[in-house]
C-alpha cells in the first residue's frame, strides 16, 4: 500500500523542527484508490484505536505497512531518531469538530508523529494541517499539508513542533501513528480505549 521509495526521496525540512511530507505516499495500484471509501464511517470526533472498530482488509494492510520495520527504518533515518526504546500507538480519526485543530505541540511521551490522510478529495480552505513557525499564528506556517488521499506528514516531536489547522466541521479521515516511549505506552492506549467507549 505504501510506496517506500517515495518516502525515501522526500526532503526533510529542518528550518524549525524536522519534518517531511508527500502529497501522495501510496502505491499506484487499484487497491489504493478505494482506501477513502474503505475507511470506517466514524461519525464522532476524537481518536479511535483500530482494535475497537471493524476494518476492511485494505485498511488493515495499510496499517500493517505503516507499522512495518521498513517504515520504522525510514523514520529513524530521515528524522534522526532512535526508536529502539519505543512502541507504536496507532489511531484513526474520521470526523473533525470545530474545536479541533488548535495550535499545539505533541506530548513529550511521543518521539515521532505520522499523519496519513485518506479523503477522496478536499475542496475546503479549512481543515488542512499547517506546520507552524510559532504558537501564535496559524497563518505563519512553514508548509500546509493537503488532506487528500495519500497525503502524509511525519515530524519529530520537539518543544516547538507547533501545528494546527483552521477550524473545520465534518468528515476528515486520517490515520495517526506515534512512536511512544515504552514507559508511556499503556497510558496512551488506555486513554484512547476509554475515549472510544464514549464515541
Regions from the PLM with identified roles:
Residues 1-154, 158-199:
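Fe(II)/2-oxoglutarate oxygenase catalytic core
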Amino acid at each position: 500500500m505504501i510506496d517506500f521509495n517515495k518516502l525515501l526521496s522526500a526532503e526533510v525540512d529542518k528550518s524549525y523542527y524536522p519534518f517531511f511530507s508527500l502529497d501522495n505516499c501510496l502505491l499506484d495500484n487499484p487497491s489504493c484508490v478505494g482506501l477513502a471509501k474503505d475507511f470506517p464511517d466514524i461519525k464522532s470526533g476524537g481518536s479511535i484505536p483500530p482494535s475497537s472498530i471493524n476494518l476492511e482488509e485494505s485498511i488493515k494492510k495499510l496499517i500493517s505497512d505503516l507499522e512495518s520495520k521498513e517504515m520504522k527504518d525510514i523514520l529513524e533515518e530521515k528524522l534522526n531518531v532512535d526508536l529502539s526504546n519505543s512502541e507504536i500507538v496507532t489511531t484513526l480519526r474520521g470526523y473533525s469538530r470545530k474545536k479541533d485543530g488548535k495550535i499545539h505541540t505533541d506530548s513529550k511521551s511521543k518521539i515521532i508523529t505520522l499523519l496519513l490522510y485518506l479523503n477522496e478529495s478536499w475542496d475546503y480552505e479549512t481543515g488542512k494541517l499547517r506546520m507552524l513557525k510559532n504558537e501564535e499564528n496559524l497563518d505563519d506556517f512553514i508548509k500546509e499539508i493537503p488532506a487528500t488521499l495519500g497525503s502524509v506528514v511525519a515530524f519529530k516531536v520537539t518543544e516547538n513542533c507547533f501545528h494546527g489547522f483552521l477550524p473545520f466541521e465534518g468528515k476528515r479521515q486520517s490515520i495517526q501513528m506515534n512512536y511512544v516511549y515504552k514507559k508511556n505506552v499503556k497510558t496512551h492506549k488506555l486513554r484512547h480505549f476509554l475515549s472510544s467507549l464514549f464515541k
